[in-house]
Amino acid sequence: MGINSYVSRPKGITNSNMTKMFQTIGLIGKPHHQGTNLTLTRLHHWLSMQGFKVIVEGRVSAELGADVCSMDLLEMGEHCDLAIVVGGDGNMLGAARVLARFNVAVIGVNRGNLGFLTDLPPDNFEEALSKVLSGEFETEHRFLLEAEVHRHGKITASNTAVNEAVLHPGKIAHMIQFEVYIDEQFMYSQRADGMIVSTPTGSTAYSLSAGGSILTPNLQALILVPMFPHTLSCRPIVVDACSTIKLVVSPENGENLEVSCDGHVHLAVLPGDEIFIRRSNERLRLIHPKGHNYFHVLRNKLGWGSKLF
């Protein structure tokens, strides 16, 4: 749609018509995690007391008791208008790849480490969440990536990613050879441990660890970050989000490779395969408490210095 991210600030609404905005709320969390289970239990009780219909993802529903309504993620996407993800960014990414196709609003409660995508505190979420449910929130749309593996002109595997798609060796780290094309224009051949193709959302994740730049979420851009390239002159490059990235794996690679989507989904790649990575038509509808500031998040999570005066 040509839009990577935008922010809207709806006016607040009264408690009497609060449920008109969100009526059915889904709860998703990290399975078998004590802190997550405690937060999910509190959320389920608190939301039910407020009169919302609450659906719990099947993987965590058993730990909340037999009387909860449970569905899998696909069913939740069809029935919920808001999903609350309890956990870290990894849990958010897993849910987002599914829920993005349904235009479900998603907000996170942080039970992980950094939590770039999870805004709400786990111990006192009630005040902030109450304001969100009454309409005091900001909406961001984050685009996803679509990765396809082509073999002899046919698609053998595909999936989507919120953060990044990564070409890399299978189980043993070693150097691989491949060519990189941008919109069918040859850019370079590469000998490296792999290639990261990241969205702005993913630029604070694996891409950042590999030396990539941080892209603000509203940028319509992708960043390509080589992993340990065998040349001193190779640097990350930022391209337009409308670009199609093609990685052609050299037939001389002796081992099977993989494309990982957000580190969760793995697509098998053989020597000679072509990987196409482009912006997906699906977008994650991420909501934040009112007053959300991206640079405040960066300062907090990355330990940047505060204002001097």
Swiss-Prot record:
One of its GO terms (biological process) is NAD metabolic process. Its main location: cytoplasm. NAD(+) binds at residues 89-90, 163-164, 174, 191, 193, 204-209. It catalyses: NAD(+) + ATP = ADP + NADP(+) + H(+). PANTHER family: NAD KINASE. This is NAD kinase. The keyword Signal does not apply. It is an enzyme of class 2 (transferase). It comes from Shewanella frigidimarina (strain NCIMB 400).
